[in-house]
């Protein structure tokens, strides 16, 4: 609770200082701890949830059933989406949880999701940075390269009857080492 409140204070101060009038929504990443007593404590702070695997969705559904997670809370579904994870995300959407937002890592996930849902939903796009990889391969699990986002939006999402773009999820695989690097990557994406 202390860390959540501290993060909320820092964002509130930064938003006020920069005359930014949108809202800040803290999302607790369930992979940081699945223990019920930690989730229950976190949820006392008016937060939202971020999932990263099929394992997380039944936990989220239980929190909703217990009344601990509001029906209008955001559930950001990150991570590689295949099989059971897509089915579980679709179940949340199809049973009327309106703020379930799958964060798409690749175009195939849009196809899999749309086959599983029976109503329109909002999605996010996970933006991969152009960082120097520490490995010799690139996987789509790391997100969609910034230069591919606008073409993907125009070609697949813009007129799609089942999905609407809600957010861009900026992702740096190695974490943010310094603010200059972060702002450089963000500016490249925005251009």
Model-found features: residue ranges?
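Low-complexity, highly charged intrinsically disordered N-terminal segments
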Residues: 1-19
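Active-site-proximal beta-alpha core segment in soluble small-molecule metabolic enzymes
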Residues: 24-190
């Amino acid at each position: 609770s202390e860390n959540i409140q501290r993060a909320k204070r820092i964002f509130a101060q930064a938003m006020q200082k920069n005359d930014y009038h949108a809202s800040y929504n803290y999302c607790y990443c369930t992979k940081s701890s699945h223990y019920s007593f930690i989730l229950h404590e976190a949820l006392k702070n008016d937060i939202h949830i971020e999932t990263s695997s099929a394992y997380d969705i039944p936990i989220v559904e239980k929190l909703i059933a217990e009344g601990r997670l509001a029906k209008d809370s955001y559930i950001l579904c990150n991570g590689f989406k295949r099989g059971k994870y897509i089915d579980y995300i679709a179940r949340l959407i199809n049973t009327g949880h309106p703020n379930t937002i799958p964060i798409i890592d690749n175009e195939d996930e849009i196809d899999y999701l749309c086959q599983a849902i029976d109503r329109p939903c909002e999605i996010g796009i996970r933006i991969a940075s152009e960082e120097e990889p520490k490995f010799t391969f690139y996987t789509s699990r790391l997100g969609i390269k910034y230069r591919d986002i606008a073409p993907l939006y125009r070609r697949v999402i813009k007129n799609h009857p089942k999905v609407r773009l809600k957010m861009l999820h900026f992702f740096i695989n190695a974490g943010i080492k310094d603010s200059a690097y972060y702002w450089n990557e963000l500016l490249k994406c925005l251009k």
